[in-house]
Curated annotation (Swiss-Prot):
This is tRNA pseudouridine synthase A. CDD domains: PseudoU_synth_EcTruA (cd02570). It comes from Bartonella tribocorum (strain CIP 105476 / IBS 506). Keywords: Isomerase, tRNA processing. One of its GO terms (molecular function) is RNA binding. Its EC number is 5.4.99.12.
Length: 247
C-alpha cells in the first residue's frame, strides 16, 4: 500500500458537508467516487477537518492509501479530470507520497481558518454563498480588540455547539485577528483544533461587538460564563474557509 497526501480546495455551498452520508451529496462521497473510478478500489479518504455543510476550503488536507504506487501527478490529474466529469466543485491542488504513519487528521499540529464578512448596504450578487453579508456598519477595530480576549487557553463552552462531541471544551486559540479590506472584513483563526461551530460562534459574537451591541467586556463575560445561551448569533457557514493545515 502507498499512502498519498492530497491538498484540495472546494466550494462547499452545494454539499452536505465533508462526511459521507447515505443519499446526500458530500465532499468525501464525491472524492471516494472519483478514487474508485480511478483505481478500482473502494477506499476511505481521511481528512484533517470534517467541514460542515456550506463550509469551503482552500487548503484542506486528506490522505488515502492505494495498492499501486502511482506517480503523484498522475493521481492529481486523473482525480481532477474525474471530478470535472462528475461536475464537482472540488479541485486537487497537490498530491505527494507520505510515510505510512502520516495521518491527515491526527498528525496535524495547526489548523487555519478564515471567515469572510461582506459589510455593505447592497447584498452580494456574485458571492452570496461565499460570505456572510451584514448590511449594518461594523467597527472592525473594536472587533479585533475584543477578539484578543478569546486568545489563549480557555473553556470555550459558550462558543461550541450543543451537539459538539469533543470530550473537553478546553482549547488553546493561538490567533484571532480581524482585518478590514474595503467592503470585506476577514476573521483569521488558528489553533491545533477547534470545537464544533466554534469559529462561527466567534464570528456571530464579534458581530455583536462590531455593531455596538456588545463591548469587549461583554464578550469576555460570555466566555467566562461557560454557557451556550450567552453566545451571540451563530454565523452562517457560507463565510467559513479552512485555509491551511500544518504538520
Amino acid at each position: 500500500m502507498s499512502r498519498f497526501k492530497l491538498t484540495l480546495e472546494y466550494d462547499g455551498s452545494n454539499y452536505a458537508g465533508w462526511q459521507r452520508q447515505a443519499k446526500l451529496h458530500t465532499i468525501q462521497g464525491a472524492l471516494e467516487q472519483a478514487i474508485f473510478r480511478f483505481s478500482g478500489q473502494q477506499l476511505t479518504i481521511t481528512t484533517a477537518g470534517r467541514t460542515d455543510a456550506g463550509v469551503h476550503a482552500t487548503g484542506q488536507v486528506a490522505h488515502v492509501d492505494f495498492i499501486k504506487n502511482w506517480p503523484p501527478h498522475t493521481v492529481r490529474d486523473a482525480l481532477n479530470a474525474l471530478l470535472r466529469q462528475q461536475s464537482e466543485a472540488i479541485s486537487i491542488l497537490n498530491v505527494e507520497n507520505v510515510p505510512d504513519d502520516f495521518d491527515a487528521r491526527f498528525s496535524a499540529i495547526k489548523r487555519h481558518y478564515l471567515f469572510k464578512i461582506l459589510n455593505r448596504r447592497s447584498p452580494p450578487a456574485l458571492n452570496a454563498k461565499r460570505v456572510w453579508w451584514i448590511p449594518k456598519p461594523l467597527n472592525a477595530q473594536a472587533m479585533h480588540e475584543a477578539a484578543q480576549k478569546l486568545v489563549g487557553q480557555h473553556d470555550f463552552t459558550t462558543f461550541r455547539s450543543a451537539h459538539c462531541q469533543a470530550k473537553s471544551p478546553i482549547r488553546t486559540l493561538e490567533r484571532l485577528d480581524i482585518q478590514k479590506e474595503g467592503e470585506e472584513i476577514f476573521i483569521y483563526a488558528k489553533a491545533r483544533s477547534f470545537l464544533h461551530h466554534q469559529i462561527r460562534s466567534f464570528a456571530g459574537s464579534l458581530m455583536e461587538v462590531g455593531i455596538g451591541r456588545w463591548t469587549a467586556q461583554d464578550l469576555e463575560a460570555a466566555l467566562h460564563a461557560k454557557d451556550r445561551k450567552r453566545c451571540g448569533v451563530v454565523a452562517p457557514p457560507s463565510g467559513l474557509y479552512l485555509t491551511k493545515v500544518e504538520y
